[in-house]
Amino acid sequence: MRENWAVVALFTLCIVGFELRFIHGATDASDTSALNTLFSGMHSPAQLTQWTAAAGDPCGQNWRGVTCSGSRVTQIKLSGLELSGTLGGYMLDKLTSLTELDLSSNNLGGDLPYQFPPNLQRLNLANNQFTGAASYSLSQITPLKYLNLGHNQFKGQIAIDFSKLDSLTTLDFSFNSFTNSLPATFSSLTSLKSLYLQNNQFSGTVDVLAGLPLETLNIANNDFTGWIPSSLKGITLIKDGNSFNTGPAPPPPPGTPPIRGSPSRKSGGRESRSSDESTRNGDSKKSGIGAGAIAGIIISLLVVTALLVAFFLFRRKKSKRSSPMDIEKTDNQPFTLASNDFHENNSIQSSSSVETKKLDTSLSINLRPPPIDRNKSFDDEDSTRKPIAVKKSTVVVPSNVRLYSVADLQIATGSFSVDNLLGEGTFGRVYRAEFDDGKVLAVKKIDSSALPHGMTDDFIEMVSKIANLDHPNVTKLVGYCAEHGQHLVVYEFHKNGSLHDFLHLSEEESKALVWNSRVKIALGTARALEYLHEVCSPSIVDKNIKSANILLDSELNPHLSDSGLASFLPTANELLNQTDEGYSAPEVSMSGQYSLKSDIYSFGVVMLELLTGRKPFDSTRSRSEQSLVRWATPQLHDIDALAKMVDPALKGLYPVKSLSRFADVIALCVQPEPEFRPPMSEVVQALVVLVQRANMSKRTVGVDPSQRAGSADTTSDYM
């Protein structure tokens, strides 16, 4: 009987405890109060399910984005939820167990709070609208390892004291308006591996970074001056858009103390004493040089003079026996005195052999010609008197790729007239070229910023590699020109222009892409990327996936243009990083480095364009809708919201299930974390299944430009 009463009592206690848990909550009271205040500061957004402005139980009720350990809140992750308002920060320091706070990619603004959770290890406030200076309160978060304030509206001098933040490994202040020199306390960041300061207005030198264990540094597009410390030259460094000195660094001014721990410090005392002793010895050691020393100098001069005379007599005698052909036979390499025309001998074209001229006997020398740096430019004065050894290129371009002259391309493009200008991209302008035989091609003039004039051999090698790409959805390279310092590539021409023009031009005609055609374009582009990523060996990272580089033929089949160009141009990464059109993956914006996964992200953005008809970044829209990814991503799994974001040009004519599955593929491709993005082969499979199901329940009404020409648009075209 007693045992039964014990069981009843225990059961009663459990019930009472359970009820008390709901009365008092499972969450620490101070944590709950802090989250209530934060919720109010963000205007009580509906997307934060379970959250309340008063009381509640964040841990017990599973508030969205909140992670707990026991009764304490340890993580808050609310990235990309279109949150607005401020941080309501006067209670944040109560979250003493919080180790991660991620509010990135929202519309939060105002100044940063005066106090932050004291034990944060990761703080991400990137891609918001925060203003003012970076709060000094960040100086007190000593456990901090990751801090990202990039893509905000901060300005002025950085007010943070970094002397206590020696655990910090990643720091991102990029794309703000910070000014003045870097804080001296940067030198205390002894664990810092990655630093992103690009696109600000910092000035002064970067000497304070010299002693840090950095592996990645991006300081592009600031006002830095001075010299790059030698310790930074062996890391991943992006520094364009500054005014750094390119010459050797000057020696330290007189009186500058030597670097701590350097050998010169150890010997300095002895040198100083020697100098002092010589001064104290008086005039006896300043009066002159001894007789023995004078005799030694005279004998040395006589020996050197005799050797010089003998050398010149020998050279003169030998030069009389030399014929002009002796010079040409040296090392079996032809060379000549250069005129104003520079002839280059490439094995890819038999007609481009080097002219060999006989040298005048009076100018003949029998010295082995020095190797010529192909990157070196010769001015007119040098080129009229110095022999130039021309390097032979051993790269062979496929025979079906034609070598054009500049004159040929000038005639075909009307001297590269504006009337024939098709577009302008990151690496140069593209012109329509019509040849005498009626053939129409597209000619791209590669800017010298992308490929300097002296790098013709590199250009030939690049052409050879791109010419070997062979896929029906990759624009074919059919010719090239390397003449007079110009580098041009010639592609097949597609009269319907680019996908960008179809989607974003105001003319009604450009809005006629029906749903099936959009899926067809997505699938064809995916197959092109699958070829580059998984068929080519080694894999090719395109780096420049965007709607402007997807050309459409008369049947609206997509052709990926400029494929491989960015992978082989030496300055491609730097040029691409200077312009962010909304296609760049988050990791590219942070590090400037491209990968197969960043290509997949960019492809996801193109799919969003096909879905919504919007540009990846549109400054004419409201702030919350300027970034297509940030605006669209939270709505991709909500069928009602999805229907509202579809391109109005479709006029509601699309299969709802097809639309939903299309959105699912997009969501996978634009995952913030690259490891969660699928390989292109899986993307292709998903789109193929989408097409197959569309064939069974086809619901497409509309007229494509191809249909106006008399050809029917059928889903079988993109099977």
UniProtKB/Swiss-Prot annotation:
Name assigned to this protein: Protein STRUBBELIG-RECEPTOR FAMILY 6
Molecular function as annotated in GO: ATP binding; protein kinase activity
Positions of transmembrane segments: 294-314
Signal peptide: 1-29
Effect of loss of the gene: No visible phenotype.
Membrane topology annotation: Single-pass membrane protein
Modified residues (Phosphoserine): 377
Organism: Arabidopsis thaliana
